């Protein structure tokens, strides 16, 4: 079973447990384990099998923390912070697709408007849970018909975009949990054509979740022999 929907949901654990036959096997598949599953491993109630290396044989891309000050204040003044503007300009010289992850739809709307103003040569769209044509936009981004995609955590997992770079805006926001940050990081370096990429956690300061996410990614690389 896919372990992701099980987070903090004892009802699902109970339902699946009841569904397994007497001699049946129950296998949870996940890129980011839950506290409940980790506890079961420590108690030796279940066994953990890890596949830390990607199919192309390269290490996971490790996020880099970047200080980004006064984002909200600048946005309210209808300005993109100078550092963020510079980072995006540098990234666009590569022509690789770029995803900007944001915590909230409202913030995403504002950033979308400002980026369209400042990057008139780019095709920029926003994807959220309320986007009716989300699948269409995702496919266009995959086909490079869209060059910059602003997204909430709706695209943190379950999608693959070749050669993509990722910036997480306000990575220290409470909605960016360790699990979410690890999953978002996993969008980078997924293709054989480009098993690397630029992966930035931008925030005014840091958070426990940011530090834990980076630690977990480094541990997976060590486990894979890097």
Labelled PLM ranges:
Residues 159-172, 182, 198-201:
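A short beta-strand element within the Helicase C-terminal
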Residues 21-25, 44-47, 120-122, 162-165, ...:
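Short glycine-/polar-rich loops that comprise or flank the Walker A/P-loop
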Residues 26, 81, 87-115:
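Conserved strand-helix element at the start of the C-terminal RecA-like helicase core
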Residues 29-33, 52-54, 102-105, 151-154, ...:
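A short beta-strand-to-loop transition that corresponds to the Sensor-1 phosphate-sensing loop
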Residues 21-36, 178-181, 185-218:
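Conserved segment of the helicase C-terminal RecA-like domain
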Residues 103-106, 124-136, 150-157:
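Conserved helicase motor
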Residues 21-29, 96-97, 145-148:
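Loop/turn-to-beta-strand initiation segments
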Residues 1-70, 77-86:
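Post-DEXD/H (motif II) to motif III coupling segment of the RecA-like Helicase ATP-binding lobe
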């Amino acid at each position: 079973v896919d372990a992701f929907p099980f987070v903090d949901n004892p009802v699902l654990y109970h339902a699946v447990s009841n569904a397994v036959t007497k001699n049946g096997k129950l296998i949870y598949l996940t890129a980011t384990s839950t506290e409940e599953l980790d506890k079961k491993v420590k108690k030796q109630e279940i066994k953990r099998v890890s596949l830390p290396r990607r199919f192309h044989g390269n290490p996971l891309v490790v996020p880099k923390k970047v200080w980004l000050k006064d984002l909200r204040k600048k946005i309210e003044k209808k300005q993109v912070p100078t550092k963020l503007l510079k980072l995006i300009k540098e990234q666009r010289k590569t022509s690789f697709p770029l995803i900007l992850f944001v915590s909230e739809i409202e913030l995403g709307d504002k950033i979308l408007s400002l980026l369209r103003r400042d990057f008139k040569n780019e095709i920029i769209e926003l994807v959220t849970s309320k986007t009716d044509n989300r699948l269409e936009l995702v496919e266009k981004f995959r086909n490079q018909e869209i060059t910059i995609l602003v997204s909430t955590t709706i695209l943190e997992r379950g999608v693959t975009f070749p050669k993509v770079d990722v910036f997480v805006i306000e990575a220290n926001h409470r909605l960016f949990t360790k699990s979410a940050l690890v999953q978002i990081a996993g969008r980078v370096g997924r293709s054989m054509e480009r098993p690397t990429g630029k992966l930035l956690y931008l925030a005014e300061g840091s958070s426990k979740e940011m530090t834990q996410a980076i630690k977990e990614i480094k541990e997976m690389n060590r486990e894979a022999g890097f």
